[in-house]
Each structure stands twice: as structure tokens, then as C-alpha cells.
A protein has these predicted regions:
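N-terminal binding-site loop/beta-alpha segment at the start of enzyme catalytic domains
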Residues: 1-66
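Alpha-helical scaffolding segments of alpha/beta enzyme cores, especially the outer helices
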Residues: 14, 18, 40-44, 100, ...
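Glycine/proline-rich, positively charged
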Residues: 72-171, 175-176
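Structural detector of well-ordered beta-strand residues that form the stable sheet scaffold
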Residues: 27, 57, 149-151, 171, ...
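Single conserved hydrophobic/aromatic residue that forms the stacking wall/gate
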Residues: 210-219
């Protein structure tokens, strides 16, 4: 999607292709990433693969819109789209966001649909439960998604969402690593009790636990 550095279409394709060659078959994206560019690039790559051979997840909770605001466009380096995003956890916005994602991904269904960052404001959680979650349940009933998930960078709200008994999985970023293991205290036991799959993201804590090899060691 072009964050934090510019990524060309070719580099994006080569990266996805290398992952595929190494046996990776789960791909996660979101409207936020590159304001739609990530979904377009992932969709272009996966359109060349057998649909039954991969698992794809994307997210709802933000809508992409056209903008001439240069600062918004510059958030994602090298982004050729004049787009930005805004939070909206309403039922209608969730349905629209999902349909837009399908178009960008060139798919008629996705395997996992995550609620994305419903902790961005004090009332976001409330609106998500009344709107987005109901829309996701409807999409699952229509069999255009297989699993309902939620992706965020904190575990407290995920523990609360688990009590709704409609989530199949959570994507937790940066909260079960060598640095931060706070999810052990409450979230992981709840996931075990509720049979909710926990997907770990940001396992290197935004590269704090990882550095690229020096040119001398890069053999």
C-alpha cells in the first residue's frame, strides 16, 4: 500500500509472488492500506491463482473517498490514487465498504471479514455493535464471507467483543510478542473458551524486534 516507503506495482507483485512460492496462502489487506491500493494489488495477483488455493481477509470500518488534499494522498508513498479514508461503522457503510473491496479485489467473496479498529473513538464501539457487526452477520448468512473477525492493536476491546458470540477470529497486532504479552492475562483464555481463532500480526512490534541484515551479511 506504500507505507512507510514507496512500493511500485512490480515490487508489490514480486513480493506477493515470492510469498506464494514459499507456500504462503493467507493474505490480509484492508481499504485503509494505500487507500485501496493494497486491495487492488493483492487482487491483481490473486486473480492469477486458483481461488480454492488461498485464504483472503479484508476489513470494514472505513470508507474510501476521492480527495484533492495533497497531505492525505502523501500518507502512502508513491500512491497513484487521489483517495483518502474515513471511519464509518454504520450498517450501510459496512455493506458499501465490503462491495467496494470485492471490486478492488476482483472477487465475489472473501474468507474472513475483519472489523477494523473500532476503538478509534469513544462511540465507535457502540456504533460498530449496532451497525457493522449486524452487517457482517448478514454477509455471513449470505455466504459471501466465511468468518467474522476483528483486527486491532489492543486486546481489551477484543475481550469485550468476544462476549457477542458472533466472532470466529481476531487479528491482534503487537500484543503477543517478546515485548508485549498482555493478551495472555484475559484475551487468550477468552478465545480458548469461546473457540475464537487468534491471528497474530505485528509480531516484530513494528520492526523493533527485527533489523535487516547488513550488506556484508546479506549473502
Amino acid at each position: 500500500g506504500g507505507w512507510p516507503v514507496e512500493v511500485s506495482d512490480q515490487i508489490a507483485f514480486d513480493t506477493l509472488n515470492k510469498a506464494w512460492e514459499q507456500g504462503i496462502r493467507y493474505f490480509d489487506t484492508a481499504p485503509l492500506y494505500g487507500s485501496g491500493m493494497s486491495e487492488i494489488r493483492v487482487g491483481d495477483f490473486l486473480s492469477k491463482q486458483n481461488r480454492d488455493e488461498f485464504v483472503i481477509s479484508t476489513k470494514v470500518g472505513r470508507l474510501i473517498f476521492d480527495t484533492e488534499n495533497s497531505k492525505a494522498v502523501e500518507k502512502f508513498k508513491g500512491q497513484p490514487l487521489n483517495k483518502d479514508s474515513k471511519f464509518d461503522f454504520s450498517y450501510d457503510a459496512t455493506m458499501r465498504s465490503f462491495e467496494d473491496s470485492l471490486n478492488r479485489l476482483k472477487l465475489d467473496r472473501v474468507d474472513i471479514l475483519h472489523l477494523h479498529d473500532p476503538d478509534n473513538s469513544p462511540d465507535a464501539f457502540f456504533h460498530a455493535k449496532r451497525g457493522a457487526v449486524k452487517a457482517m452477520i448478514k454477509l455471513k448468512e449470505e455466504k459471501v464471507i466465511k468468518a467474522i473477525g476483528c483486527g486491532m492493536n489492543q486486546n481489551e476491546m477484543l475481550s469485550e467483543l468476544a462476549q457477542l458470540d458472533c466472532f470466529d477470529c481476531f487479528l491482534l497486532a503487537g500484543r503477543y510478542t517478546l515485548i508485549d504479552q498482555t493478551s495472555i492475562e484475559r484475551l487468550i483464555p477468552i478465545c480458548e473458551e469461546k473457540n475464537i481463532t487468534l491471528i497474530l500480526g505485528g509480531i516484530f512490534n513494528s520492526c523493533l524486534l527485527y533489523t535487516s541484515p547488513s550488506p556484508r551479511d546479506n549473502r
